[in-house]
Amino acid sequence: MALVKYSTVFFPLRSLRLFVSIKKAYYHSEPHSIDLFHDKDWIVKRPKFLNLPKNEHSKLDIFQFNFNKSESNNVYLQDSSFKDNLDKAMQFIYNDKLSSLDAKQVPIKNLAWLKLRDYIYQQLKDPKLQAKTYVPSVSEIIHPSSPGNLISLLINCNKISNLVWKSVLKYSLSNNITTLDKFIHVLQQTFDHVYEQEILPMMTNTDDTDGAHNVDITNPAEWFPEARKIRRHIIMHIGPTNSGKTYRALQKLKSVDRGYYAGPLRLLAREVYDRFHAEKIRCNLLTGEEVIRDLDDRGNSAGLTSGTVEMVPINQKFDVVVLDEIQMMSDGDRGWAWTNALLGVVSKEVHLCGEKSVLPLVKSIVKMTGDKLTINEYERLGKLSVEEKPIKDGIKGLRKGDCVVAFSKKKILDLKLKIEKDTNLKVAVIYGSLPPETRVQQAALFNNGEYDIMVASDAIGMGLNLSIDRVVFTTNMKYNGEELMEMTSSQIKQIGGRAGRFKSRSASGGVPQGFITSFESKVLKSVRKAIEAPVEYLKTAVTWPTDEICAQLMTQFPPGTPTSVLLQTISDELEKSSDNLFTLSDLKSKLKVIGLFEHMEDIPFFDKLKLSNAPVKDMPMVTKAFTKFCETIAKRHTRGLLSYRLPFNLLDYNCIPNESYSLEVYESLYNIITLYFWLSNRYPNYFIDMESAKDLKYFCEMIIFEKLDRLKKNPYAHKPFGSTRGHLSSSRRRLRT
């Protein structure tokens, strides 16, 4: 085959065109897909071995580690027990991972072996290795994901109790467990990590990747082979708001040994977690930002877990999984999480709670998967009425128990200030960028009667218990990110249905009733039409390939392909071949996040996929902080949140009355802190000192609450939405002095 030299790499002549396409796509403002699925002769890009002795590059069956006299000050040479265990474990790994391979697998696994040894040499040569102060977490023991911390993990593996180790290794309580057993487990897992995340993504598309490309990318049901091995029972609980759907599903969940509640918000996951514990039912909590394991005296986790839908362990076996708000599977941004969970959870029963609009879509999916389907329909527990006329006298016509709905922070805070100025009513507020804890506080003040009126966005549509008598729509239009659009009947029903939902029975003993109205006749007419409209059935489920499938597909791309190009190409290929049942998740927000770290070459491909799902709010202060966090991952540093140059000096009680520090600054700080928690759960070796982070989070929540309570003027009245640049730069100047 003819070869063309490009820099120091030789490419097949017929592949040069695609290489140039990649270079163009990489530097273009918008990532372009490239036609790679039919051109697969790529040259392997070998990993670099900067610390491995040259004589070991070709000779593989070496299990010991060799150092010169100047490098003798390391644990391997000074601790004979450590040396003996490491040598024996390395020999075991070699025999287990390399000796029994067929000829096609050998070259790739050899590279993983050499890279593993290179990591070990690098750390043993490091005089600044802070191994003795390092305390590994249980998650690091189970699935080590940071080869750069391997030696520290081995040195400190005995800090994890043997009971936990026996659970990890599936030893019986009567069996003894040795340090060598622990070394072997950690090294096996680290070898697999290096092989799958660092070596495979650089390989050619050949048969030596264990059938990685056999997955049918055009059929999402086949992405989850474990779920296809069993015939699951899908049980639907469908009905309007306040019909008891989720309650019935949770009753079933309580009765089993292994189960998962998957909610749309961490606020809801926490609510179920707290409810179970109040009923003396053991339960774990699993959200992107918070993980709480309910352990018994022997270190065994509870069988039930409450969490967010994105965190569902797809391949873990369950008796019951509850997917709440299943109609969210059509959401362009997050719908993939519901769709993938429905297709992929390995559970005897899968309970789906949601609106009737999703029924035909679920029927089609269940027909595709071959599962059994049972449908339970429920009616609303209370009455819901649309008032005949709009409210007289505008704001002065509001009464205690009303919830006024608006769709921007500026409008919501304008309404709060105007209502409190023109009436004697006290106003609580809820909108999407408020911390969940603050939303709970505001809801509690409204529910217990301390505050009279609630002014809120569509954030009240799910996740909060609110004792609303009447929902008052200020408009029937909502900005969708690109243009102002009329709200769908489903959206109006979801919000309007909150009226009367958590009210007790009326004084006369009748069924509790909720009301819907508006300030304007035109809006009220539109709302009534939507409430009375027939069900709008959802037509497509939003999906996206798992990180594992994306990684398998990456082996079909040449080395150095930007992550954004890979994702765009997958999206385009699926759109071409997929039927109308599934559609692809909107890439805009994902690509915007990827753009913050894509240039960082030291972040492995798998980590880039993981980071593309980070909850990064589109606020200048937040995106800058996330970029700094990604640099920490790229450099494999260990840092606490306070070590970053961020304006945490504003988390001071004296700043509360200072109106130059707006709510938005504190909302940005809060999002940075929760982003740090999200990263710490995935990179516990890099992001540490969670106690300080928890304190900062608490202070931030407190100040936001106080800022709302003392609000005298709207901080969004005279500046573009989302701008925190002025506050950030002035705060940084203070931090430098």
Swiss-Prot record:
Which residues are listed for ATP binding in this entry?
A: G239, P240, T241, N242, S243, G244, K245, T246
Provide an example Pfam family for this protein. Answer: Helicase_C
- Name of protein: ATP-dependent RNA helicase SUV3, mitochondrial
EC number of the protein? 3.6.4.13
Start and end residues of each Helicase ATP-binding domain: 226-365
Cross-referenced Gene3D superfamilies, in alphabetical order? 1.20.272.40, 1.20.58.1080, P-loop containing nucleotide triphosphate hydrolases (3.40.50.300)
The record lists the lineage as:
Eukaryota, Fungi, Dikarya, Ascomycota, Saccharomycotina
Give each disulfide bond as a residue pair.
none
> EC top class, in one word?
hydrolase
Helicase C-terminal domain location is: 390-546
**Superkingdom of origin organism:** Eukaryota
- Free-text function comment from the UniProt entry: Required for intron-independent turnover and processing of mitochondrial RNA. It is a key control element in nuclear-mitochondrial interactions.
Q: Which reaction does it catalyse?
A: ATP + H2O = ADP + phosphate + H(+)
Q: What is its main location?
A: mitochondrion
Q: Which InterPro entries match?
A: DEXQc_SUV3, Helicase_ATP-bd, Helicase_C-like, P-loop_NTPase, RNA-DNA_Helicase, SUV3_C, Suv3_DEXQc
Q: Which GO terms describe its cellular component?
A: mitochondrial degradosome; mitochondrial matrix; mitochondrion
User: What keywords sit in the KW lines?
Assistant: ATP-binding, Helicase, Hydrolase, Mitochondrion, Nucleotide-binding, RNA-binding, Transit peptide
State whether it acts alone or in a complex, and with which partners, per the record.
MSU1 and SUV3 are the two components of the mitochondrial degradosome (mtEXO).
Biological process (GO) annotations held by this record are:
Group I intron splicing; mitochondrial DNA replication; mitochondrial RNA 3'-end processing; mitochondrial RNA catabolic process
- SMART domains per record: DEXDc (SM00487), HELICc (SM00490)
